[in-house]
Amino acid sequence: MDIDNFIRAKGAIFSAIRTMLSSLDFDVSMIDDVYVAGGIGSGINMRNAVNIGMFPDIPLEKFHYIGNSSLTGAYLMLLSTAAEKKTYELASNMTYMELSTVPTYMDEFVGACFIPHTDTGMFPDVMKDQQNRK
């Protein structure tokens, strides 16, 4: 059961990334940085996370762990009116997306529930590393 839950969580993360990128007509090559926050980022090996298809196959230098960002943000808002103003400004510029209502999301999710994915072409560096290990 734990493995099933992990695979579903990994699939949800990757399919959410793909769905959001697709909604903007972006692809993974356009990602400059990925900020990983919270408990998942503190102990994760990013190379392994990419290898299993949790995150896109992009250079590891683009991934940044930023800690407990919600707690830090709340703390800064309490201490600084400038930070509070910036927080509201950022929030007003965000777009909410209900992934379950996006027609392609479930297809993305199902494909992402395989390791690394049913479309291994999205993971060229991972596949090359696997070939080199043989």
Label each residue range with its predicted role.
Residues 1-134:
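Helical "lid/coupling" subdomains associated with nucleotide-phosphate turnover
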